[in-house]
């Protein structure tokens, strides 16, 4: 039996739970929240939907329901408000994360932890410290969504199917994230060359506009509807799918990166091979000097916030 425990039944938690249930990634999904009535209501609603899909058990309960869970997905935390940086949330959500993981560990036997609560890079590092598990068994959602936005934007500009675009956002899931233009390509053809073929100026303004689109996307959504949900929910689903199907897929998840690219003891996103045991390998391919410098700057930002805890 594959059991997934979802901690937090807000927009993100339920978007993930719905996507995971529809994809039938597990036959037992447990919803846990400080608001037990809300969790029960969400489980009842989602269970009704599953009657039209297939035999997926949806239920709610306390932390004791984490027993036997293969994967624990943590989405609970203080809500990001309009205009508020993800890193502004650090102290409040670090405390919440510690409490949640301490409770989970009383019942769960060495699950994989998937972190989504913001600031996700800082809290992924906190989770690794609290749980004491192997580094690859605590995975932050990181820039999986940012990379998807990046690929989608590039695909739209170039007029190609997004599935042929290979491009990564690395570093912090937030304002200091870095676009790896030096590695970006369309089925092996560098984005710079694709732009030239289409008469598009591949200059600093072009690159800054594209990265700005990615960086500001969440703020634009929050400003209009108050929160994000579907994008990050599906990103979490993609990570869990890669684990449960042992895909060895490459995703830009947040993980401890000490020693990679000369970085210190922080967690941030780099392309990682994801399989049944979590993160199997961190891929640190050669990147441009300016990208290396920007990645180091992103790591310093996160290091400062970790030091402030």
Swiss-Prot record:
UniProt-recorded Gene Ontology molecular function terms: L-lactate dehydrogenase activity
Catalytic residues identified in the record: 173
PROSITE patterns listed in its UniProt record: L_LDH
Residues with Phosphotyrosine modification: 219
InterPro entries: L-lactate/malate_DH, L-lactate_DH, L-lactate_DH_AS, Lactate/malate_DH_C, Lactate/malate_DH_N, Lactate_DH/Glyco_Ohase_4_C, NAD(P)-bd_dom_sf
Location relative to the cell: Cytoplasm
Binding site for beta-D-fructose 1,6-bisphosphate: 151, 166
Enzyme Commission number, as recorded: 1.1.1.27
GO biological process: glycolytic process; lactate metabolic process
Activity regulation statement: Allosterically activated by fructose 1,6-bisphosphate (FBP).
Keyword line: Allosteric enzyme, Cytoplasm, NAD, Oxidoreductase, Phosphoprotein
Stated role: Catalyzes the conversion of lactate to pyruvate.
Entry similarity comment: Belongs to the LDH/MDH superfamily. LDH family.
Designated name of the protein: L-lactate dehydrogenase
Native species: Nitratidesulfovibrio vulgaris (strain ATCC 29579 / DSM 644 / CCUG 34227 / NCIMB 8303 / VKM B-1760 / Hildenborough)
């Amino acid at each position: 039996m594959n059991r997934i425990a979802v901690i937090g039944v807000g927009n993100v938690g339920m978007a993930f739970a719905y996507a995971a249930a529809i994809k039938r990634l597990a036959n037992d999904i447990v919803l846990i929240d400080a608001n037990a009535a809300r969790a029960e209501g969400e489980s009842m609603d989602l269970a009704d939907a599953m009657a039209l899909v297939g035999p997926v058990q949806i239920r709610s309960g306390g932390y004791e329901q984490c027993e036997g869970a293969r994967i624990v997905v943590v989405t609970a935390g203080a809500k990001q408000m309009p205009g508020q940086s993800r890193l502004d949330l650090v102290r409040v959500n670090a405390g919440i994360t510690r409490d949640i993981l301490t409770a989970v560990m009383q019942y769960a036997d060495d699950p994989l932890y998937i972190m989504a609560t913001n600031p996700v890079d800082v809290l992924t590092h906190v989770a690794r410290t609290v749980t004491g598990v192997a580094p690859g068994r605590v995975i932050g959602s990181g820039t999986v969504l940012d990379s998807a936005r990046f690929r989608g934007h590039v695909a739209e500009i170039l007029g190609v199917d997004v599935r042929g675009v290979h491009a990564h956002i690395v570093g912090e899931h937030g304002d200091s994230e870095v676009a790896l233009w030096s590695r970006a390509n369309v089925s092996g053809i560098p984005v710079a060359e694709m732009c030239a073929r289409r008469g598009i100026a591949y200059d600093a303004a072009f690159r800054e506009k594209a990265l700005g689109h990615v960086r500001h996307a969440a703020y634009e959504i929050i400003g209009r509807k108050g929160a994000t949900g579907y994008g990050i929910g599906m990103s979490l689903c993609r990570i869990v799918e890669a684990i449960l199907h042992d895909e060895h897929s490459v995703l830009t998840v947040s993980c401890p990166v000490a020693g990679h690219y000369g970085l210190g003891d922080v967690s941030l996103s780099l392309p990682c091979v994801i399989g049944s045991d979590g993160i199997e390998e961190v891929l640190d391919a050669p990147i441009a000097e300016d990208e290396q410098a920007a990645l180091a700057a992103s790591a310093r930002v996160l290091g400062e916030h970790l030091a402030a805890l």
